[in-house]
Amino acid sequence: MSSRKVLPTKINLINLRRQIRLIRTIKRLLENKREVLLLYLRQYADEYEKVYNEVSKVLSDVYSTYLQGVASEGLSTIQTYADSIPSSLNVNTSIKVLFGVKIPVVDLDESTIQQQPFGNLEISPYILKSREQMSYAFKKILTLIEIESSIRALSGELRKTQRLINAIDTSILPFYQSSSKYIKSVLDDRTREEFTRLKMVRKLLQRRR
């Protein structure tokens, strides 16, 4: 939209200047929001790296212990044990709001973890240990999923915030500033013309006297 399409009146000039101040205030708020989002993202990124390393180590231990159990019991026996245990794990999901951004929360319902899934069966201690390790690893994996989803949500909000700032800098604010400048220029010209006309009228009146 051209700034010349705005009617050059004093009221419009006052309104434009007021809107320019408001736009600059909004931009400052968006810039503050961007800084806070970046801070949260850095924190989540650090936490993600920490938990990821923990998960990698735990899973490595799980596989190592599990393979020892397989070597001890035999793969077919382990498969029979696994098939005899019904699925019971339940994961609860919810949403929390962080600085206006919806963040997913994922929790394992620990009451759904079977305490003695193998009953009174004689089973390799390696399998029992790997199961305990996997239970811990699963909780960490859920934490990792939650952090990753949070990073994705915060990154999306950051991109949206940056687009708004860019729109203000490249389109909105320049339009209002050029419109204000155009109206001021027209009003100044009118003032000068009015002043010149008054001078001429005064001279004419003086001559008639």
Swiss-Prot record:
This is A-type ATP synthase subunit D. HAMAP family: ATP_synth_D_arch. It is found in: Cell membrane. PANTHER family: V-TYPE ATP SYNTHASE SUBUNIT D. It holds the Pfam family ATP-synt_D. Its main location: membrane. It is a peripheral membrane protein. Component of the A-type ATP synthase that produces ATP from ADP in the presence of a proton gradient across the membrane. GO terms for cellular component: plasma membrane. Has multiple subunits with at least A(3), B(3), C, D, E, F, H, I and proteolipid K(x). Belongs to the V-ATPase D subunit family. GO terms for molecular function: ATP binding; proton-transporting ATP synthase activity, rotational mechanism; proton-transporting ATPase activity, rotational mechanism. The keyword tRNA-binding does not apply. One of its GO terms (biological process) is proton motive force-driven plasma membrane ATP synthesis. Keywords: ATP synthesis, Cell membrane, Hydrogen ion transport, Ion transport, Membrane, Transport. It comes from Sulfolobus acidocaldarius (strain ATCC 33909 / DSM 639 / JCM 8929 / NBRC 15157 / NCIMB 11770).
